[in-house]
Amino acid sequence: MANLYETANRWMTERKIGFIDLMLPFYISAACCHIINLENKKREFYFEHGQPADMRLHMFITAPPGYMKSFVLKRFLDRQNSLFGQTAIKTAFMGQVTEAGFVGTIQSVDGESVQQPGMAYDFMDHILGIEEFSALTNTMTSDHSKNLDNALLTALDSGYLIKRLAAGELRYETHLTLWAGSQPARFNLSSGLGRRFGFIYFVPTAKQQLQMRQFRREGKGIMGSKATADSVYHLTEKFTSDAQKIKEISFADSIYTGLDAMEVPHYEEPLYEKIALGYNLATQPITPSFTVRLSDAIKRIWQLENEWRFKIKSGALESQVMQFIIESPGIEENVLKTKLIDFGMSFAETSALIDTLYKQRRIGIINDSKDKHARKRYLWPMS
């Protein structure tokens, strides 16, 4: 019998949804972590440093405008025809959400303070997809954490949310798992908030752009197999039931050997542990004493996450420009700028990034020596 991951893969393939090899492992892992976290909050069987561990894996996808951010989240979470839409996993999908809308607030009604908890309360046991969460994005793109709302941070960390306002105190517990996204930006992953998300960085190569065009066309008129949808339903029901049997969770030495080999910073290890935990839960039989082990598949998933986090740490926008130059060595500057318009970047933004990359010695620039009046510049990646 196929496991949950294999069945979800088949569900996506039947519906002609592209690049599932890149994205599906992370979202399935996060979904399994969500279920096991709810169970751990009920029975408290897995502890870290004397506290019941929070096992949620929040996800954040960064991609240019029009390149699958909303599409991916909707196919997992939105309405009954999504992957998890009719399963034991509670899901919701929202468009634009403010910080107050997520955390909540207190308002004065007829002279009395009335609590108005936000989505973190309303969907406390859901996986919530948010198309545009400006407060979250603004916090992670800030050079410092001074603008960080502590209530937002704790909602995604321990789940114990306390927000003190002039009208009173807002206090509740949430176990919501958040999946969000934005356009490429300079994210500060060393901040408390950035460390709590697994990142997917998707700036399609020229080949992938052609594949996207093909996937879009192939998906016309495709409903997908009801039998596969039923299998996803039954497997999530079984997983939720089997999770109730778990009495302890341990991590094999191979997990830490793998993390040491990748030189993962200690403050990012919990993220990689959760990826491995979720993937093991989705692919292995559930036992009362469940051991998380390293596999070739997990090594590949970890490597993807490591590469994406490096690109984001070093500048997601710079990485986007570099990708085009690496694909087309010697590309003329104005040709590059024109291409990047379709990726949400203005001529001025691209010019500034080219100058930055040149100063960092990541690219070389050759001026057109044949026509001095043309002022053409050709860009090359530095080895």
Locate the predicted segments by residue:
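Charged, amphipathic alpha-helical linker segments immediately N-terminal to NTP-binding catalytic cores
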Residues: 1-28
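Terminal-proximal interaction/regulatory segments of ATP-powered molecular machines
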Residues: 314-383
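Short, hydrophobic/amphipathic alpha-helical patches that form generic packing surfaces
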Residues: 21-38, 274-281, 359
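Phosphate-sensing "switch" segment of ASCE/P-loop ATPases
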Residues: 142, 163-176, 181-319
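Charged, alpha-helix-enriched surfaces in structured cytosolic catalytic cores
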Residues: 3, 17-21, 67, 71, ...
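Active-site-adjacent bridging/hinge elements
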Residues: 1-7, 48-49, 244-255
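Long, charge-rich low-complexity segments
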Residues: 72-99, 310-342
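Conserved ASCE/P-loop NTPase catalytic core
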Residues: 30-207, 358, 364-369
